Amino acid sequence: MRLLAFSIIGITSLLLIACKPNTRSDVKVSEIIKAGEQAPYADPGQKNFGGFQRRDTTGKAQAPRPKFQMPEVKTVHFNDLIMSDPFIYPHGETQTYYLTCSGGWMYKSSDLEMWTGPYAIIDIKGLWLERAGFAAAAEIHKIGDKYYYAGTWSDHSELIEQVPRRYNVPHNQTYLLRADNPEGPYTSFAIEPGYDYQPHDWDCIDGTLYEENGKIYMIFVHEWTQIIDGTMDYIELAPDLSYTVSEKPITMFRATEAPWVTEMNASGEATFGLKMPGWVTDGPQMFRTQTGKLGMLWSSWGKERYAQGIAYSESGTIAGPWVQEEEAFMANNSGHGMLFKTFEGKLIFVVHHASENGPRKPQYWNVDDSGDKLVLGTQINI
């Protein structure tokens, strides 16, 4: 286990990040960040994201997540699925829809109504990924004649940074696996086993793949839990996706650039049972409208807790600049959505939603991409 000590310069930098001006005049951190202190515990009954796992300042990594036990494979109705971060890959050759999510496994369906699963489709034996309890925000992409599985793993046995008055950051990375068909098995192919595609000392999650002008990029989240004002960043990958060719990630935007995003403490939201101030970035997904406008679906916290937002690129390329919509695309504690087309050519938005006291469940929504901006329609009830 490697402990990176905070220098006086590092602590000062963190304080400056918390207090530095940004594009919104209404933005401020609701609690002063003092070096070396643990974030206050959540109040009894307070809204809380991510459970109540306590963080400390002892220099130890968090307790590891419990490993998920694979449930029995069975066929269930879409409305009975319970999951976060749904991602659907339509496979035209077999007329099969493949659904992945946080947890890392796969379901499959021929009609988007009845889903069979979950199936274990990855082989990570011998990699540090085994020490993670599960893969978060799993996705499947086809590039060339191969299928790629992007998932986020969190190795809680390695501490990469002890952030003052926040929490101890574990080794968080989005890693890529590869297979010859969408059902796997997906195995490591990186230039070296356990290769870090993102900087090792960054808290990174939710990586997704995007192709533009013959180049392949990974777009990912640099977590607000580490840097207070979360960012979206990207790196360029090698043509075979086995390593990163970028010297360093490029930041696309910060959470505070979106007018609809609220600061976690100000909105009354605790995280991991602690009152950590900051602004969230989550779940990037790229899309183009029929007019060629490049957009990114992404999530954060707004007036109604978790929310789905959109940013658009003024240049039509990944380089941006990225302009945020004034209002959330979808609120009501819903987010981490993505777009896919049915085999009949219909565009559908799939997203997870949680009622006040209920679990996260996926939903289908109609959307219209015929103009320069994506327009949300009605929920699809099946």
Where do the model's predicted regions map?
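Sec-dependent N-terminal signal peptides
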Residues: 6-11
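Carbohydrate-active catalytic/glycan-binding domains of CAZyme proteins
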Residues: 21-382
